[in-house]
Amino acid sequence: MYNLARQLLFKLSPETSHDLSLDLIGAGGRLGLNGLLSKSPAKLPVSVMGLEFPNPVGLAAGLDKNGAAIDGFAQLGFGFVEIGTVTPRPQPGNPKPRIFRLPHAEAIINRMGFNNLGVDNLVSRVQAAKYRGILGINIGKNFDTPVERAVDDYLICLDKVYAHASYVTVNVSSPNTPGLRSLQFGDSLKQLLQALSLRQQELTQRHGRRVPLAIKIAPDMSDEETVLVASALIESGMDAVIATNTTLSRQGVEGLPHGDEAGGLSGAPVREKSTHIVKVLAGELAGRLPIIAAGGITEGRHAAEKIAAGASLVQIYSGFIYKGPALIRESVDAIAAMPPAVR
C-alpha cells in the first residue's frame, strides 16, 4: 500500500508531499486508523535514560516539527516519537524550495532552517494529544538570536517543554542555522551544557521528576572532536547523545540531480559516517552515557548495525520517507534477531 502512496506523493514537490503526509498521518491518528497501515512490531522493551521503551526504534525529529501528528505516528508502531525542532518564537525558516529528494541514493537534502510555530504552539498540541508513550521534544534557537545568546533560547524552550516531555533533545548540530554548530565545541559547548544542567536541576525540584537531556551532534566531526564532545557530555552530567544529524558532505550523491543543493544531507549516504561516530562515542563513553543512533537506516539490518556499533536506541526519518511504516517493524525484528549479548 505504501509503495502506491509513495508513487503518488513523489509526484508532488517534496514539501507539499511532506505537509500532505503529515495531515494524513495526523487524521489517521485521530480516527485510530494508522494501526491498519502496518503490522505492529514485536515487543522488544529496553530501558534507557531511566525510561522504559516498548521497542528501540523511534521517529527522529524534523518530520513532525510542531507536534501535529503525535498520535498518528505513535499508532504506526514507533517505540518513541521525537518532535521538533522547536524554537522560542515562531519562524518561517529558509525560502522555498528547501527540500530535495535524491531517490537514486535514497537521500534527502534539506535546508528548512527550523521552520516552526513556536514552543507555545507545540506545547498546546502535546497537551491535546492522547499519546502517553515516550515523547522526545527537540529544542533549538531562533534564527535571529545571536549565537552568543543561544543559551537563552534553549533555556526558554526547556522551561516550557519540561513538564510535557519524556526527554528533551538539545539540537546544536543543524547545518541550516548559521553558527549553530559552533556550539558543539570548546567553551561554547561547556557553557551551554553547564547552563542546561543547572536548569535541569532546578526544574527537577520544581516538577518533582527528572527529565533526561540528550545532545544531538553532527556527523562532520573528526574522531578527536567527537572524543572531546563525549568527555564534555560526561563531565556535565548529560543523559544521552544522539548521533547524528545531517551531513554537509556530498559523498555518494556527486553528479545526481539536486546533489549540489545547499543544506544537510540525510539518508543512505550518511550511514557509514554516522555509524562511525557511534563507534567512536561508544569507545569513549564506555557505557557511561547511552547513544541514540540516527542516520541512514533504510533497511532493518542497518538498525541492527547501529546497535552493534554501540547504540541503545535508533531513530529513522529519511528511511521512513522511502520505505514507509514497514521499516519500523523490519528494524525491530532485525534488532530482536541479534544475540542478547550484543544488543
Curated annotation (Swiss-Prot):
Query: What detail does the entry give on cofactor binding?
Result: Binds 1 FMN per subunit.
Q: Name one GO molecular function term.
A: dihydroorotate dehydrogenase (quinone) activity
The top EC class, named as a word, is: oxidoreductase
Coiled-coil parts of chain: none
Q: Which Gene3D superfamilies match?
A: Aldolase class I
Matching entries from Pfam families are given as: DHO_dh
Task: Specify the signal sequence span.
Answer: none
InterPro entries in the record, alphabetically?
Aldolase_TIM (IPR013785), DHO_dehydrogenase (IPR050074), Dihydroorotate_DH_1_2 (IPR012135), Dihydroorotate_DH_2 (IPR005719), Dihydroorotate_DH_cat (IPR005720), Dihydroorotate_DH_CS (IPR001295)
**Topology relative to the membrane, per the entry?**
Peripheral membrane protein
The EC number(s) attached to this protein equal 1.3.5.2
Which residues are responsible for catalysis?
S174
Q: Which residues bind substrate?
A: K65, N110, R111, M112, G113, F114, N171, N176, N245, T246
Subcellular compartments: Cell membrane
Chain sites annotated for binding FMN: A61, G62, L63, D64, K65, T85, N138, N171, K216, T244, G267, G296, Y317, S318
Q: Which GO terms describe its cellular component?
A: cytoplasm; plasma membrane
- Tell me its cofactors: FMN
* Assigned protein family: Belongs to the dihydroorotate dehydrogenase family. Type 2 subfamily.
* Self-association and partners: Monomer.
The name under which this protein is listed is: Dihydroorotate dehydrogenase (quinone)
- Protein's organism: Pseudomonas savastanoi pv. phaseolicola (strain 1448A / Race 6)
The encoding gene is pyrD
